[in-house]
Amino acid sequence: MPLYKTELHCHTRDGSCCASESTEATIEKYIAAGYTSLVITNHMQSYRIGSTEPFPFSIPTYEEYVDYCYDAIDLARRVADGRLYVLDGFEMRIPYCTNDYLVYGLDRECVKAFNIIKAELDTASKYIRENGGVIVQAHPMRFGMTLVRPEYIDGYEVHNSHNKPFMNTMIREWIGHIGADDKIFTAGTDHHNHDDIPSAGILTEAPIKTTEELISVLKSRSFKIFPEE
């Protein structure tokens, strides 16, 4: 039985200032790499709202920031034109901390309705879950990250292709020590630039065509991550 590949961590130049590859090039790259689905997870960071930097390094209001993020997802869908399923997501950073969290399952209007990147983690997590979403701590062992209480998140990104290999090993060891083996474990390329090779994600027996299907797959753990470590 064929397995279908989904990327869970991908940035595009049209939605993340730290990414340099165009949406068009990114979509073609993932199609060529044999992926069926792609979650666009551009950054949403609280410190970028209303700063003195020029756009898009600074965005005047939260609502405009949400539109900027989701417009990039819509652009990716248009570019893919049915050749690749493009799904909603974002990578958020909340105040007073350099941790990053991958959020799946919330549409544009849901994110606009509550300033999620100004909230404390427990409040943000509660909102995400109450609205059917999933929150995963991204690259937890990267330098500058802080490990958080497991009850505030649904899962951990246990493989990130931008990490040093020992960082991916360490998170698995830490999860075992704290008894958090019931959490969702994910993998992602953390794609940003032209030289980033799509190399990670999840494998499923059926293609993931919608964000709702993605949430169902994640919550049911009906997938395998790749690469295996």
List PLM regions with ranges.
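Charged catalytic cores and adjacent phosphate/nucleic-acid-binding surfaces used
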Residues: M1-L8, T12, T23-E28, P95-V111, ...
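A conditional alpha-helix N-cap/helix-loop micro-motif detector
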Residues: A19-S20, I117-K118, M167-N168
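Glycine-rich tight-turn/loop motif centered on a GG-T
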Residues: F57-T61, E109-F114
